[in-house]
From Swiss-Prot:
Organism: Bartonella quintana (strain Toulouse) (Rochalimaea quintana)
UniProt keywords, alphabetically: Cytoplasm, Endonuclease, Hydrolase, Metal-binding, Nuclease, Ribosome biogenesis, rRNA processing, Zinc
EC numbers, comma separated: 3.1.-.-
Any single GO BP term: rRNA processing
Known cofactor(s): Zn(2+)
Family under the similarity heading: Belongs to the endoribonuclease YbeY family.
GO molecular function: metalloendopeptidase activity; RNA endonuclease activity; zinc ion binding
This protein's record includes keyword Hydrolase: yes
Binding site for Zn(2+): H118, H122, H128
Name of the protein this chain belongs to: Endoribonuclease YbeY
Function: Single strand-specific metallo-endoribonuclease involved in late-stage 70S ribosome quality control and in maturation of the 3' terminus of the 16S rRNA.
Subcellular location per the Swiss-Prot or TrEMBL entry: Cytoplasm
Family annotation (NCBIfam families): rRNA maturation RNase YbeY
Length: 158
């Protein structure tokens, strides 16, 4: 079982129950898909706004702009490594996720779910630094999202 800790830092995120439900469903589906359903761990999510996300992105990645999701693993895992007692932290910026969903013709909840799955995979050691890593991570995202009845987020990008 994984304990989910959610902090809502922006009034733009106006439905904490919906955030918890989406996170729980995305987390369970991801962990089951990776055969990690028996892991005992904890994950923290911060739902914030673009202004705060830009500050965090500048501080930790030297990029002075907002982004959709940032992940900070508790341990430096490689893909396939067993996670520890703390998975890590995921931060999601509301305005960026809303804008991307509209631009890509997706529902907000589907895109948010994708960002949470993406963040969880980063916490579990998956990356997209190389072409091979990106292909592996995107394929996992497609498979997990399909189990959540969400269309391929990369279909129009391929």
């Amino acid at each position: 079982m994984i304990t989910i800790d959610i902090t809502v830092e922006s009034a733009r995120w106006n439905n904490e129950k919906m955030l918890y439900d989406i996170t729980e469903k995305a987390l369970k589906t991801t962990m089951n898909h990776l055969s990690l359903e028996n892991v005992v761990s904890e994950i923290s999510l911060l739902f914030t706004d673009d202004k705060h996300m830009a500050q965090i992105n500048a501080q930790w990645r030297n990029k002075n702009k907002s982004t959709n999701v940032l992940s900070f693993p508790a341990l430096p895992l490689k893909a396939g490594d067993p996670p520890g007692l703390m998975l890590g932290d995921i931060i999601i910026a509301q305005e960026t996720v809303v804008l991307e969903a509209k631009k890509e013709g997706k529902s907000f909840q589907d895109h948010l779910t994708h960002m949470i799955v993406h963040g969880i995979l980063h916490l579990l050691g998956y990356n997209h630094e190389t072409n091979d890593e990106a292909c592996q991570m995107e394929e996992l995202e497609r498979e997990i999202l399909l189990k959540l009845s969400i269309n391929d987020p990369y279909a129009e990008l391929s």
